[in-house]
Amino acid sequence: MRVLLVEPNYKNKYPPMGLMKISTYHKILGDEVRFVKGFDNSVDDEVWDRIYITTLFTFDFDLDIETINHYKFLVNDINDLYIGGIMASLMPENIVKVAGIERSHILTGLFTDTSVVGDDNDINVDELP
């Protein structure tokens, strides 16, 4: 499986912990994983089996929605696009309304059960390094 991890173009020093744990999870499964920040045109001509996009602060809502709308067309099936992070946990219904993503594809809280992304294993992603 080809997995793309996306962080909107925030001004920060460290990569998002949640996406890094998801990276570890997919590498354990033997998947190809790529991380990008902001709008990375180098991945625009590729089709991805699964895309995860993180969100951070609520004041970055517009940037997050722009990022979601940019990358949602690069996933093989829109049902394999997942949005998570702090803002997604606080404002899931706003993302549903504005970006047209199904509520079940907005990951809120901890990522302890991989069945929420359609996987069937006992790995607790939040416990991974």
Which residue stretches match the model-derived regions?
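A short, structured N-terminal alpha-helical element that caps or precedes a catalytic domain
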Residues: 1-94, 98-102
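N-terminal [4Fe-4S]-dependent radical SAM core
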Residues: 1, 92-129
